[in-house]
Regions:
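Peripheral, non-cofactor segments flanking catalytic/redox cores
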Residues: 1-116
Length: 116
């Protein structure tokens, strides 16, 4: 009786996880596009990172702080932990678990944390 409802609940959670992974993947693409187009500008009053977060905040209707966080996690997913990012995009882990892995490996000197 409850199994079908629980199955739908599990699938909804996986869909939410996949959406979070997709959001970070798209933000990562946006980051690459900005850097290819503008690069790091020494003459700008702000750096490219700030410009990207300002654009994201306006587009998504979120604070710049949250946009900054999304960009940092998107960069971690793309550059440092693509395998963990793949788990998030597949819905196998949730966004909080992804954040925890990123945080705990942020300054890790262990080479296994880096892509091959």
């Amino acid at each position: 009786m409850f199994e079908s409802t629980m199955g739908r609940l599990r699938e909804a959670a996986r869909a939410e996880n996949r959406a979070a992974g997709q959001r970070l993947a798209v933000i990562g693409e946006l980051d690459v596009l900005w850097l290819r187009h503008f690069g790091e500008r020494e003459t700008w009053g702000t750096d490219t990172h700030d410009a990207i977060t300002a654009e994201m905040a306006a587009a998504l209707g979120i604070t710049r702080g949250l946009a900054d966080s999304y960009l940092d996690y998107a960069r971690a997913m793309r550059l440092r932990l693509p395998r963990v990012g793949a788990l998030l995009r597949a819905g196998d882990i949730d966004y909080r678990s992804f954040q925890t892995v990123v945080y705990r490996t942020d300054w890790s000197p262990i080479p296994i944390c880096w892509p091959p």
